[in-house]
Amino acid sequence: MVTERQQDILNLIIDIFTKTHEPVGSKALQESINSSSATIRNDMAELEKQGLLEKAHTSSGRMPSVAGFQYYVKHSLDFDRLAENEVYEIVKAFDQEFFKLEDILQESANLLTDLSGCTVVALDVEPSRQRLTAFDIVVLGQHTALAVFTLDESRTVTSQFLIPRNFLQEDLLKLKSIIQERFLGHTVLDIHYKIRTEIPQIIQRYFTTTDNVIDLFEHIFKEMFNENIVMAGKVNLLNFANLAAYQFFDQPQKVALEIREGLREDQMQNVRVADGQESCLADLAVISSKFLIPYRGVGILAIIGPVNLDYQQLINQVNVVNRVLTMKLTDFYRYLSSNHYEVH
């Protein structure tokens, strides 16, 4: 069990270590901890026994272990403080006109990368919860066409496909009509269910040639299940992550899944310190925070960095960006709901 004084010592060691990246000795703690040097050394030894501190090879000082950072994250972080001195710079970064949701998310990721020196990922609303608000088919050539989806009036997804053999022009019109009548206004999850339950019977009723039509439905809608993800500062991973982690970030859909699984449905914010047993994010820290996307749901901002982060500072920065981002998104969707349209 960690005593209150030991927790204060651990917090102070982490605070000093994240700024200096040097082992911390008992003398460096005496000004802030109202105890003798011997008492502090005993407490440091006890923290080491509990696996929260570890000895440095070249110094008599101690530094936090991964378990120590995990304990700090769980027991000492303040998730409600704002870094007032950085509010102006963050607000200033968003003081521009945006024409696409992805551009707003990218600005958020770029800003947090510049502030933190880490890798940042921004996720849109979970794909299964987005609604299909518009659909069209554009014929590209004799054998190819493009399905164009609009989700939540703000995200465009396209899927190119081969027109089935023996498909007539009127069959493409039927396909378009069925999708517009049956799917518009429904969530992607509802559409997935309808393709498996309702569409097979409808195909039999409306199409003379039914070969591969159900496969065509599944093909053109597959893209809608992909996460809308933006990333910034991937190259920063080379400063603190192993090659496997860097290569993992070449798979954005897997990255999105990893981030979502690290944040429970009832959590708005979480700090996860991954140990060496978690191969894809081994010895990395992930600070993830949900933000409101007005009229649509919530997205996620995630900072990925080394274990020895200045967690409190980064939490402050994420909180400020979240609030400013939500205000900007409110203006953006108010604009979309007027007589204006997003430029794609």
Swiss-Prot record:
One GO MF term attached to the UniProt entry: DNA binding
Domain of life: Bacteria
Keywords noted in UniProt: Repressor, Stress response, Transcription, Transcription regulation
Main function: Negative regulator of class I heat shock genes (grpE-dnaK-dnaJ and groELS operons). Prevents heat-shock induction of these operons.
Gene3D superfamilies in the cross-refs: 3.30.450.40, Heat-inducible transcription repressor hrca homolog, domain 3, Winged helix-like DNA-binding domain superfamily/Winged helix DNA-binding domain
Native source species: Streptococcus pneumoniae (strain 70585)
Family, per entry: Belongs to the HrcA family.
Name of the protein this chain belongs to: Heat-inducible transcription repressor HrcA
Pfam families: HrcA (PF01628), HrcA_DNA-bdg (PF03444)
Annotated GO biological process: negative regulation of DNA-templated transcription
Gene giving rise to this polypeptide: hrcA
